[in-house]
Design a protein with these regions (language model features):
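C-terminal structural segments of small proteins and small subunits
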Residues: 51-85
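Amphipathic, hydrophobic secondary-structure cores in small proteins
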Residues: 2-5, 11-54
């Protein structure tokens, strides 16, 4: 298991992801974005899952990026733009 940090473009993404994770019984927590990572709406979700499964929780247009901690720092695994409306 590994812990991943999800950043979002807005709080709507946080709420939608939280609801999906709760419904699936996943282990996660919502918190403020760490100071050394700025961006998005100010909230993030920490998700614990096996490597490779984190991608299924990305919500297009809402998820900004996914990070994990590596060698004492942050590693960006993926970055997503905002979908046009």
């Amino acid at each position: 298991m590994k812990e991943y940090l999800f950043l979002f473009h807005s709080t709507v993404g946080v709420i939608q992801t939280r609801k999906a994770l709760q419904a699936a019984g996943m282990t996660f927590r919502v918190s403020d974005i760490p100071r050394d990572l700025r961006g998005g709406c100010g909230l993030c979700i920490w998700l614990t899952c096996p490597p490779g499964e984190e991608i299924q929780w990305v919500i297009p247009g809402h998820t900004e990026s996914v990070f994990c901690q590596q060698d004492g720092g942050w590693r960006c695994i993926a970055h997503y733009g905002i979908s046009p409306r």
